[in-house]
Amino acid sequence: MRADVQNLFIGIHMLYFAHERKLTVSDMQAELEGYGYRVGEREVKQELERLTQENYLTAHGDEYSITGTGIEAFKAIHAKLQVLCSEVLTPAQTAASR
C-alpha cells in the first residue's frame, strides 16, 4: 500500500479510537500493528501530532482526546466510508451481466 494511502487509513483509525477513548502513542501503535500496519513509535506520534494540528485531537500530557471538530470529521468520514464500502465491497458487475 502506498504510504500516503496508509497514512489516511491510520488517521481514520486514530479518529475512530479517539471517538471511543483517550489515546496514547504506545496503545495506538499496538492497535495499528494488530491491524497489520508496520509503524514505529515515531510515525504514530507524528500522525497524532498532525491530527492535533488540524484540531481533530487535543493533547493532555501523553494522552490525546478527540475534539468537536474531530467528531464532526469522523462523522463525515464514516458517511463517506459507508458509501465507498457499499460500492467497493460488493462484487463488480461484468459487462456481460449489465
List each language-model region with its residue ranges.
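Amphipathic alpha-helical dimerization/coiled-coil segments
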Residues: 78-98
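Short amphipathic alpha-helical interaction segments
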Residues: 38-53
